Swiss-Prot record:
Residues 160-331 form the OBG-type G domain. One of its GO terms (cellular component) is cytoplasm. It comes from Trichlorobacter lovleyi (strain ATCC BAA-1151 / DSM 17278 / SZ) (Geobacter lovleyi). The lineage of its organism: Bacteria, Pseudomonadati, Thermodesulfobacteriota, Desulfuromonadia, Geobacterales. It holds the Pfam family GTP1_OBG. This is GTPase Obg. GTP binds at residues 166-173, 191-195, 213-216, 283-286, 312-314.
Amino acid sequence: MKFIDEVTLHCASGHGGAGCVSFRREKFIPFGGPNGGDGGRGGDLIFEATKALSTLLELRHKQHQKAERGRHGMGKDRHGAAGEDLIVKVPVGTLIKDFETGEVLADLTEDGQRIILLKGGRGGQGNARFATATNKAPKFAQPGEEGEERKLRLELKLMADVGLLGLPNAGKSSLITKVSAARPKIADYPFTTLAPSLGVVGYKNYRSFVMADIPGIIEGAHEGAGLGHRFLKHLERSGILVHLVDISGLPESDPYAAFEAINRELAMFSEELGQKAQIVGLTKMDLPTAQEHLTEAQAWFQERKIPVYPISSMTGEGVEALLDAIAERLWAAPREEW
């Protein structure tokens, strides 16, 4: 399935039905009083979060969403039926914004969470409502109230406990494949991962947690370089970031400069993301060149007081120690504090 995490919608609630102008007409009562019924209210437009969806793909081709209008009132004091509410289902983690102003209208973070975003218009009153002692036969009724309209921007931010980040081809997909049932595409070239991938990690006696493999980040990502800032937002909800660093290319490559560049990108994207706790995983420890530079790399990160764990997703070396560190940090604070 194609991963879609942003979509624009044109939304409207239902108009209210019009009130009816009608008079009682029966045999021997040619000039009966008014009996026009009220119009029904228009349907509300409601958003509901559901775990059954993982992408906004279904809405990409349904960009106009409108609730049903209320039925018009009728004679014999019959009221129009209310318009049916329209429930738009979205994945858990969907942020709803006003397209024009960018104002956040809703943040749906729980399964089953609902919000009435646009209220349906009220139904108009029929002429029976307007009869008075001085006007016993009103020949007018109220029109239905118009529904609300709004252009919305929906953004999906993945609800992951752990966000994996690093340069393209740093070993993120290999790690999530090793520790979960997720099976992202893996190959020896940059940008193998073109969409976020989620994996559930069940580990020892800890509660299971969700890990997200985010497409590789390069310098300028906050401005859209590489796969762009559209994926940085998925790290914002993570409780902890695991930054994977490949030192097997030393001395030709400079993983330390890359590490600092990626962290600058996080800080430029959002201050909160730049300050989020990180654990470093030194990947590809099954390669001799990575082993050669291990002591140097550990010293570099330890000087900066950054927890560092050498791992190999190929052999499993060090993976258990990394998962221990992740789990201990995750359950040290409740999720609402992340």
